[in-house]
């Protein structure tokens, strides 16, 4: 929901910020997000809009926290929002409530409950992430198993909730977003919710994604230029800055290396199930406050 704070403009649904010409940013509660992909159940961050077209596809947007507990991943399923205008900047305060886990479901049998199956699945996903030579085989294996057993990806309540506050300061004239992440805790409906625990959580990832069919080209300050599958699904960026490019809409978004974090790039496009491209900052759980700048650029 969008929460009213003293002196701030509020909205009951989406918050939309115009950038340049037909390009804008949008964030809103999960029920206002398109439902084309399994990740529609997840709470998204700032997504790019061009002439009314959502460019995020399956991507979760800019500045979205994800938590790792070993090989298990926790996703945001709810949000509280507030915003205000400061000169040429608009400030959005988002509190993400981390309360969803990925599950497999069968239309006839419902949610798969086998702990051993999820143990295997999560370890294979971790192998896919960490060992690039195995990715093609693991993707083919996943697709085969899903087809054979009629499995689909869903996201269900995890049974616990952690809160992560993310402030976005958007300079619409410059096309710059300053993102401040605070994992020390927040409140939900007036009740305190714990932040990210130092023990138990093994990694905090701040995702910055849009759609893979739009942003299909990677470029960085070292001169590397990659397209499509050559980008990889989760590879570390070593250059000082890096961008994803959408030639159709003449757009790019760019991030830089930040002390205390590792920057990863990725792109996946698998049928109608997966379509994301972008970056993730990987942080240890002890780093509970983190700030970075994301630039959105209009290309010639």
Label for each model-derived stretch:
Residues 1-110, 237, 243-244:
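Beta-strand-rich N-terminal accessory domains
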Residues 4, 12-18, 24-26, 90-93, ...:
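Ser/Thr- (and often Asn-) enriched beta-sheet segments in non-cytosolic proteins
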Residues 20-22, 30, 65-72, 97-103, ...:
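Generic structural motif
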Residues 21, 29-30, 46, 78-84, ...:
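Extended low-polarity, hydrophobic cluster-rich segments
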Residues 58-190:
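Extended, loop-rich substrate-binding clefts of extracytoplasmic carbohydrate-active enzymes
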Residues 189-197:
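A short beta-turn/strand-edge loop motif at beta-sheet boundaries
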Residues 197, 201-211, 217-220, 227-300:
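Beta-strand-rich recognition/accessory modules
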């Amino acid at each position: 929901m969008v929460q009213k704070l003293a002196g701030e403009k509020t909205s009951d649904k989406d918050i939309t910020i115009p950038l340049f010409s037909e390009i804008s940013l949008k964030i809103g509660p999960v029920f206002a997000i398109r439902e084309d992909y399994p990740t529609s159940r997840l709470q998204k961050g700032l997504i790019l809009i061009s002439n009314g077209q959502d460019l995020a596809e399956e991507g979760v947007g800019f500045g979205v926290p994800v938590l790792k507990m070993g090989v298990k991943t926790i996703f945001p399923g709810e949000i509280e929002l507030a915003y205000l205008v400061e000169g040429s900047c608009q400030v959005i305060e988002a509190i993400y409530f981390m309360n969803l886990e990925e599950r497999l479901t069968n239309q006839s049998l419902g949610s798969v409950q086998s702990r051993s199956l999820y143990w295997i699945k999560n370890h294979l996903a971790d192998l896919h992430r960490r060992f690039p030579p195995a990715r093609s085989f693991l993707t083919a294996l996943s697709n085969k198993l899903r087809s054979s057993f009629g499995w689909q990806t869903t996201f269900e309540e995890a049974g616990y909730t952690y809160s992560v506050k993310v402030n976005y300061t958007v300079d619409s004239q410059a096309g710059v977003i300053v993102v401040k992440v605070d994992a020390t805790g927040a409140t939900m409906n007036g009740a305190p919710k714990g932040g990210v625990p130092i023990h138990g959580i093994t990694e905090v990832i701040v995702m910055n994604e849009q759609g893979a069919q739009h942003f299909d080209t990677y470029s960085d300050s070292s001169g590397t230029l990659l397209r499509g599958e050559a980008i990889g699904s989760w590879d570390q960026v070593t250059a000082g800055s890096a961008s994803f490019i959408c030639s159709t809409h003449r757009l790019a978004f760019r991030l830089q290396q930040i002390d205390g974090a590792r920057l990863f790039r990725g792109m996946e496009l698998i049928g109608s199930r997966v379509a994301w491209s972008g970056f993730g900052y990987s942080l240890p759980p002890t780093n509970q406050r983190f700030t970075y700048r994301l630039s959105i650029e209009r290309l010639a």
